[in-house]
């Protein structure tokens, strides 16, 4: 159930959206037409590159204008709307129950010391308090495009082929525990974190309570939402190195920890004890993308793009990785990768619970 695909150019070459749409369409049998979505990084390279790009879905009802004003009132409390417009779409492809709107936005200078926290607060306030609107992406130079529909329908609806990005993630949904609606489609995004997920997170209740202790609010009725918030908490707010943050999500088994060298054993024990509420149980495979985030790697701080994939500790959901020149791919199935890149340099199956981490070349 569910199909995921992601790729990144480590040279940061711009790649048209028709590539990700074609790859996801080959995974459509893993979904059931009840949700598909895409996220592109680097899609706003012009004068809005340094603005937060809020993609917001607003109910397509007679209350649309009223809801839109409520959204703008929240935004204007904390900063300036530089530009806003309806996201271009094609008519007659899917039922347009939501109107996708985007705001290019600058946070007020008085919040400069906590700018990203303010953006998170805005997202939580809109999703929690405004009936009929929800934020689907809120990062810089990126955008999420999702809806109820098959992969090719959603791609045509949003004109994905008109966008170019250096990294793309996409998802074909097969909902099992919640109803199909636009907000429940993947990817899930917060700031520069974007998550696509195949499987079921049976620990959702525990994970939800854990992030809510830190002010996050889960309102989109699906387990994947909480993963984006956990990543933001661990890596942005708590500044935990990416490998150790992912170890909190899929920690080593206790018998493995017992066999580690002392320093490593103490570290993994501390992660399990301090971040037990972040541990994901159940069968899952996730792919995550983020640019411009502070990622601690081997003691060094990098401010650049990172894409990674991760499965549960016994790999109950598939995840395939591949490389070709500067390109790296992550997918549920090798066939989706070969649909857009038939001649690969390397293909491998990541070990259970072990991440694949891709960074741009320098």
UniProtKB/Swiss-Prot annotation:
The entry's keywords: Glutamine amidotransferase
Residue ranges of every copy of the Glutamine amidotransferase type-2 domain listed in the record: 2-362
Entries under Pfam families matching the protein: GATase_2 (PF00310)
Active site residues per record: 2 (for gatase activity)
NADP in keyword set: no
Protein known as: Uncharacterized protein MJ1351.1
Native source species: Methanocaldococcus jannaschii (strain ATCC 43067 / DSM 2661 / JAL-1 / JCM 10045 / NBRC 100440)
